[in-house]
Every structure is written in C-alpha cells, then in structure tokens.
C-alpha cells in the first residue's frame, strides 16, 4: 500500500541585508550555477523549467541548458518600486509529487516577510526516494556553501514547522537543519550526526529515519535541541 503524501518544509533563510547587497545579475548567475550543480546530486534535480500557462508552455523554458530563460524571467519580474526584490519560481518537470514533482522558489528581498530559498513541496523527495535524508543533506550542504547569505536552514514536516515547534516565535533545527555556528556533540548527544561546514557552521541530522512529528522521540529530540540552541543564543527568531 502506498503511504499517504506528507508535506515537508525545506527552507533556507537569507540574511536580508546580506542578500540584497548582492547584485541581481550576480544572484541570477548564482541561481543558474546552483541549479546546474543540483543535477549532479540526483536525476530528479537535473532539469528546471519556468512556470507557464500550460504544461506544454512550461516545458519550453528549461533554464539549466538555456540560462537566457532565467535571465529573461528575472528581467521581466523587475519592479522599480521594489528594486531589491528578486523572485524566481521553477519546476523540475515532474507532474506527480509522489514521483518527485518539486518546485524551487527564490525570494531575495528586504521586505517584512521571510527572504529565502524554498523547495516546495519537499515531501515529494521524501515520497519518491528510498533514502531521502542523504540527498536532502547534500542539497542543504550545496546551498549553504554557495550562499554565504543563508543564515538558517530547516527541513521538517510542514505540520511541525507551522504548529508543533517548542518555540512558536523562533526557527527550529527540525529533522535536518543548518546553524551558522560550530556545534559540539557534547551539547547535542541525541543528534545522529553533526556535519561541519568549514567557515559556515554545522548541519545537524537529528535521526536517520524520516521525521514524524507524531513520534514522541522525534518530538522530544528536536524540542530538546531547539531549547539548547536557545540557551547557546543560536536559535533565531522566526523572521529576521
């Protein structure tokens, strides 16, 4: 029997002041390099298309092989009233989320809402892959390495991210998360793995299996680690 689809958040938050100091052209070029590099991680991430009015139209605007499509989308979306705003929405060409259908959203700005890179819905990768955690870690590692402006990253069930956190006004480390500080195993003994990212911080993997917010051990471990991060002064407010 096929397991029901479960929605997951995969959000990498920008420091707004830092990302808006990067020129639009540099950001677009970096997005293109990033999408190209994702293809080396898994075939599901090998092609990315602009959103279109129909499936046929969308499939005409692949951006990895045709960087000009990405550049045109960025130019079309420019608004003189909001010069720091850069928004790009792409899709990996898979229609069925259960087979890995995924969107990539890029929101760089200094507005009141969160500025971030998102994969929507990351539950698609959880559903489609036998070992999604390994790929998600590599996607997160690639992101924080390529974007020094990312100041937090989290992968967690959507229900937990929106309603289940211990600190409703703060971020969470989730199932897999990035903290821009060096974390010590002695402070997080229940974490499955702490991955040092030189000159950037630490990726924390809390457990090998996919996080289930209904699992009491999962809930306890993430809550305990979020509490420790608050004690260390490392768990940021929900928005910056």
Regions found by a protein language model. Give the residues of each.
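Short low-complexity stretches enriched in small and charged residues
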Residues: 70-76, 107-109, 128, 159-162
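C-terminal interaction module
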Residues: 1-49, 156-240
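Glycine-rich, often proline-containing surface loops adjacent to acidic residues and nearby aromatics
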Residues: 4-14, 107-126, 201-203
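Short helix-loop boundary/capping segments
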Residues: 114-174
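Short, flexible coil/linker elements and helix-boundary hinge sites characteristic
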Residues: 39, 62, 76-77, 131, ...
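N-terminal low-complexity, intrinsically disordered segments
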Residues: 26-101
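Acidic, serine/threonine- and glycine-rich low-complexity intrinsically disordered segments
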Residues: 95-113, 165-168
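Residues in well-ordered beta-strands of folded domains
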Residues: 89-91, 103-105, 118-120, 176-178, ...
């Amino acid at each position: 029997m096929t397991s029901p689809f479960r929605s997951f958040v995969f959000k990498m938050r920008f420091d707004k002041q830092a990302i808006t100091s990067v020129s639009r052209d540099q950001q677009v070029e970096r997005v293109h390099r990033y999408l190209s590099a994702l293809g080396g991680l898994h075939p599901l991430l090998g092609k990315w298309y602009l959103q279109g009015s129909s499936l046929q139209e969308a499939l005409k605007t692949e951006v990895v092989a045709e960087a000009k499509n990405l550049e045109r989308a960025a130019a079309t979306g420019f608004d003189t009233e909001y010069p720091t705003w850069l928004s790009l929405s792409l899709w990996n060409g898979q229609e069925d989320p259960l087979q890995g259908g995924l969107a990539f959203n890029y929101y760089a700005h200094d507005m009141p809402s969160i500025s971030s890179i998102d994969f929507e819905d990351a539950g698609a990768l959880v559903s489609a892959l036998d070992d999604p955690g390994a790929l998600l870690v590599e996607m997160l590692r690639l992101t924080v390495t390529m974007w020094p402006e990312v100041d937090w990253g989290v992968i967690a069930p959507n229900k937990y991210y929106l309603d289940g956190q211990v600190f409703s006004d703060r971020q969470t480390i989730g199932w897999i998360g990035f903290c821009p500080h060096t974390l010590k195993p002695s402070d997080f003994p229940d974490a499955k793995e702490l991955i040092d990212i030189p000159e950037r911080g630490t990726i924390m993997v809390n457990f090998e299996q996919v996080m289930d917010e209904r699992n009491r051990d999962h809930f306890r471990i993430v809550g305990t680690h979020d509490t420790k991060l608050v004690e260390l002064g490392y768990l940021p407010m929900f928005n910056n």
